Amino acid sequence: MAVVTQVVRSEWTKIRSVASTVWTLSLAVVVTVAVGTLLSGLANSQFSRMPARERLSFDPTNISFAGMTLGQLAMIVFGVLVVSNEYSTGMIRVSLAAVPGRATFLFSKIAVAAALVLVVGMVTSFAAFFLGQAMLGSHRAHLGDPGVLRAVVGGGLYMTLIAVFSMGVAAMLRSPMLSLGILMPFFFLVSNILGNVDATKKIGRFLPDQAGSHIMQVVPRVGDDVPYGPWGGLGIMGLWVIAALAGGYVLLKRRDAQ
């Protein structure tokens, strides 16, 4: 137990001493909150001109999280750099020499980074919600309304899982450029295409971001017939995260440090 505590402290020192930690997490907060606030204000100004069908399905809570699409990209960068920086700098050899137990090394790093992201994600989610609702005026939702608190807490969990999934992928690929070169297009382009094209919707709905984002919905979308609820979607996302971490651990255990 003493060894694990020492490793956790070491990983915390590494993470907080790297400049990328500050700018990636700060960017995630600023972008998510700013875009959500802006689009909430726009929705309020355009609400009376919306078609009746759109007004009936309008989700004031979810519009606050419109910035998550961009904010999650910063979380992906953070997750990748937390793991891959040690490979790109060569520090992985020193780290594994100091901590021979590879499970202890990897999961201590993941635990520290995930705890930090969870705090940042929750702050971001609550800030985006309250500022977004302030911009919505009479169309706002309240934290005590049915499903709203679940959606706001879920927003923080969603950002955390995105970052941890990225850590698992980076542990498998080791290269920051390769990891980002796969994850960025996957979440920003491929997932959206698969989720919006009729022929591939049934596949796209089970991708991590598509499934996980349902936790932030309070009002169901028109025509949304997914076979899972908000927590079920987050559970699917959790399975993707577990698979990525398992793959990262297996490859770390089998490969030489380099």
Mark where each language-model region is:
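Generic structural signal for small/hydrophobic residues in well-ordered secondary structure
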Residues: 11, 99-101, 169, 175, ...
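Juxtamembrane transmembrane-helix termini
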Residues: 41-48, 85-88, 201, 250-257
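Junction motif at the cytosolic side of a transmembrane helix
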Residues: 236-258
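A residue-level signal for alpha-helical anchor/packing sites in multi-pass solute transporters
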Residues: 82, 91-93, 130, 168, ...
